[in-house]
Amino acid sequence: MRLVKPIFLCACAVVLMTACGRMDKGAQMKTENTQINQFTESAFDADTKITDVIRDPAFGDYGRLLFPVDFEIPDNLKLKDVREILPWYSKINTDKTVELVNTMKERAQSGEQIFYDIYSDAEKKADPEKKDTGLFFFRGDAGAKTAIVNAGGGFVYVAGIHDSFPQALELSKKGYNAFALIYRPGAQTACEDLARAIAFLQEHASELQIDMADYSLWGGSAGARMAAWLGAYGTSYFGEADYPAPAAVIMQYTGLSEVTGNEPPTYACVGTSDGIASYRTMENYIARIKKNGTNAQIEVFKGLSHGFGLGEGTVAEGWIDHALTFWEENMGDQK
């Protein structure tokens, strides 16, 4: 009996020590998980580093495609400084940039797939440059019409954060399904990627719950040329199967002058102070499309320079509503 008490006490001590150890480990794991959740769930703001957005776990491997992959982004650059990696652009709205990355993060965290590859692993292995392509999905209503938005960047880089993501987000708010394409810089490769994107969406429309009938192609600067070229020449010209032409092409600030006679209905807008895309060239382009009997429209905004995006707070504010109305008016007239 004398031995029972010490043994019992020792056993209790071991149990208590083990339990405490488990509690300590549990508390440590809880603390670590809390820290991870705090990092993952915290909202971005104007002072958030761009590299922190890119590396956020919510975005996985595609976070790098949120910003131009063709430029080295300094680690100290913040969201409020994004204009420093967007040459040729103006009227960059920090509040919109913050809204965009927060919206995309929230959707990704909720389990929504917001990014889609357009090339297979085998295709990307054969051509590593195809790794830097894909579609960001700004989901609207299930079964709603589809817009594909292409940012510019002079075929040197892709300015999606200012020239396609904001437009796609606004279209999704109005119920439309909008995709922002990240493509390989270069006129030919960019058009090949857009043709592939159209093919991908046509082939996966059912599972994506989108309507590709009467789809539209949108673009700014170089992205506008892509939209116009695919609209006029078609997907087969750029290596894909022959899919229907868009119901409308929506172009911003590009000095394209070539008219083939196969252009879809086209809306354009540009500023009078654009030193890259002459508004007179765009006026002439639209006039020639109209002369061919195709519906076309242009808005010219006094004093605006190149790359004004949504044009919030400028004389161009609201142009996207006019473009949307133009698209809607031309639905049902696909070639």
Positions of PLM-derived features:
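A short loop-to-beta-strand scaffold at the N-terminal edge of the catalytic core in hydrolase folds
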Residues: 125-139, 145-146
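Conserved alpha/beta-hydrolase "acid-adjacent" motif
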Residues: 275-284
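Short beta-strand element of the alpha/beta-hydrolase
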Residues: 144-153
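C-terminal catalytic histidine-bearing segment of alpha/beta-hydrolase fold enzymes
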Residues: 32-63, 292-335
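Short beta-strand/loop motif that positions the catalytic acidic residue
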Residues: 268-270, 274
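Primarily recognizes the serine-hydrolase "nucleophile elbow" in alpha/beta-hydrolase
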Residues: 192, 196-263
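Short amphipathic alpha-helix adjacent to the substrate-entry channel of hydrolases
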Residues: 160-179
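N-terminal targeting or regulatory segments adjacent to alpha/beta-hydrolase or S9 domains
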Residues: 6, 14, 19-132
